[in-house]
Amino acid sequence: MISKPKLKLGFFVTLQKTKFILVNYLSVENISKAYGERVLFENISFGINKDQKIAFVAKNGSGKTSILNIIAGLNNPDSGQVVSRKGISVAYLAQKDNIDPTLTIEETIFATDNKILSIVNQYENALKNPDDSEAYQAAFELMEQYNAWDFETQYKQILSKLKLDDLTLKVGKLSGGQRKRLSLAIVLINKPDLLILDEPTNHLDLEMIEWLEAFFAKEKITLFMVTHDRYFLERVCNEILELDEGKIYKYKGNYSYYLQNKEERLALEATNLGKAKSLFKKELDWMRKQPKARTTKSKSRTDDFYKIKEKAHQRRKDHQVQLEINMERLGSKILELHKVHKSFGDKKILDGFDYVFKRGERVGIIGKNGTGKSSFLNIITETAPVDAGKVILGETVKYGYYTQAGIEIKEEQKVIEVVKEFGEEIPLTKGRRISASQLLERFLFDKKKQYDFVEK
């Protein structure tokens, strides 16, 4: 016989489950967007909640930037709506900025509606006029009242980390990379509730990217971003939102989790497609044997047949860019640099630099922003002169130089017209040639897209 255990008096601790309340910042409800006959996406829906750090992934040309523009309020969907929580602040880092080129960096930073920034600006202006004690006292009291001291320290740190040290520089005099970093600094300094980012790591060197990763890790900020930097995505984002074949898929994890689960999803889809094809074959045989006079039961089965047919004939549109380059025979001499010097004012880029490029080498150039990487490329491609030394190019060598600025494109041109300006045909390996249209197809521009205007 098992005796009943004796109960001892003591303390009872009640464990309560912590309730996590999801605070929705923004909801995308059944939005669609098309340009002419080209449908980017149709009836897609998703939400962005507080503290989520979401990466939005999709194939090129499927409308990632269009979606960012829509949720940022810069563009309207053809149908559906975007509903945002009342009172939240939203900031958007677009690929192209609209900063006033006549302002200085400092003026640009303070030309926002941020109240704390306005107070910091007032305080810093007061410091420049020490004789006006009343203005200084008023500014000091506001800094105390709004506890703006930490804010001042942080905004200066952000500018420093992004190498925006000379605040007197005019925006119009900045390089493309500096303007991008200034745009990033502005959205970070303003501390929005929801931050939308389009390629945030463009024009950032490794040190800046690592700092930005750490910044997002410690800051309580909600992110929705598009980036091709998979390592940045892996370290920053805690959720992946994918637009694939017109459908939205959610993955609650980082990029590695997404890759693993997407592979499993595609494998399951392939299995289901195989089953659908087998069932379609069976039902097709039944359809062919059926008499014209149908019963109610057979009519129902016939209706199901057409649904099965549609499912069995689904195909994934997986395209990959395939490149072939016609390489002409090279001589023994490729490119040589001998005792090359290059400076911009007091800043030395190259100081007696020597290097002999060998056939088949694949050389990467790394360095912090502003150290002269682009200048070095301009020197070896002979688009910029050297101060001293020699750059010797082999007689059979031809350059292909893709710059950050790309090529000049007129927006009123069609895509196919831009390519044809460089040639109607493109030489490939083994003496083969393809047309400009075929080249564009290899870069995922189908026949319809080729006749779209560049501005679209």
What does each of the following model-derived ranges do?
Residues 133-142, 281-289, 318:
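A short, surface-exposed helix-loop junction/capping segment
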Residues 261-294, 298-304, 308-315:
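Intracellular alpha-helical coupling/juxtamembrane segments of multi-pass membrane proteins
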